[in-house]
Design a protein with these regions (language model features):
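N-terminal pre-transmembrane cytosolic regions of membrane proteins
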Residues: 1-97
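Membrane-associated alpha-helical segments
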Residues: 214-250
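Alpha-helix initiation and N-capping motif
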Residues: 13-16, 157, 208, 240
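Extended alpha-helical interaction modules
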Residues: 51, 62-216
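Short small/polar-residue motifs
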Residues: 42-47, 128-134, 236
């Protein structure tokens, strides 16, 4: 499976939905431009999934089962599907190739041979399943998640992979608030220092009128700061909650 999550600007929504409905080899009369979910299966068994979220969209391509050695390899027959996946509008927030094999022995061989960074590679068990990732972008611009099913039923395995992907996706969505937090940190520190200064001057008995004017100006600055950050910080809190929930489910 290959999955890409993108941030889409409002003016690109129509173009993006139109692109989503052009899944190669898939005829979906119900894939209307207003749909938030579009999916289909092309001849040869390649599955396509597209879903619109509040701020982002997730596009996924699920390839038919292939040799273990090829789970991260882009084959010639994959070109149309990968073209659909990579040509969509919007800024890429996260792009991951998920390789699924039957056993840990197969997965360990792949981890040695397919460019995982030995220094950064981590692995863990989730029930029967074991997963590996080095959390790096590789030469093709995708991260890699390697999964050994170890006998887990296909439906349960699908749910587990979905939760792992959602954990990573919502974590990255939460991090959209980091640049703003860093940018506004100085303003917050300045406001805190101003409050301390005014309090100290009040204790010394300075003129009430001047202090009142400064407090009014400070309140206005804080109100503007709150308004400028409210949406992004609220979204960050919501995405963090979802990521935490997915982690608890795992």
């Amino acid at each position: 499976m290959v999955q890409v999550i993108r941030i889409i600007e409002a003016e690109d929504h129509g173009r993006e939905r139109s692109h989503a409905a052009t899944m190669p080899g898939v005829t979906r009369p119900e894939a209307q431009l207003s749909a938030r979910h579009i999916s289909g299966v092309a001849p040869g068994g390649i599955e396509y999934l597209w879903e619109r979220h509040s701020e982002a969209t997730t596009s996924s391509v699920i390839f038919p089962r292939r040799r273990s050695a090829d789970v991260f390899v882009e084959l010639q027959d994959d070109s149309a599907a990968m073209g659909w996946l990579t040509d969509a509008p919007g800024g890429v927030l996260r792009a991951v190739r998920v390789g699924i094999v039957e056993t840990e022995a197969e997965a360990e061989a792949i981890a040695r041979e397919t460019g995982f960074s030995e220094v950064d590679l981590v692995s863990c068990h989730i029930g029967k399943v074991r997963i590996w990732s080095d959390f790096l972008l590789h030469g093709d611009g995708f991260g890699r998640l390697l999964v050994a099913a170890n006998g887990l039923a296909p439906l349960d395995l699908g749910r587990l992979v979905q939760r792992v992907q959602e954990l990573g996706n919502y974590r990255n969505m939460a991090l959209l608030g980091l640049p703003m937090a860093q940018e506004k940190a100085r303003e917050v520190a300045d406001a805190e220092a101003a409050v301390v200064d005014i309090a100290e001057r009040m204790a010394r008995g300075e003129g009430d009128r001047a202090l009142l004017d400064e407090l009014s100006a400070l309140a206005s600055r804080v109100t503007s700061l709150t308004a400028a950050t409210a949406f992004r910080m609220s979204a960050t809190a919501a995405y963090t909650s979802i990521a935490t929930d997915r982690l608890a489910q795992l």
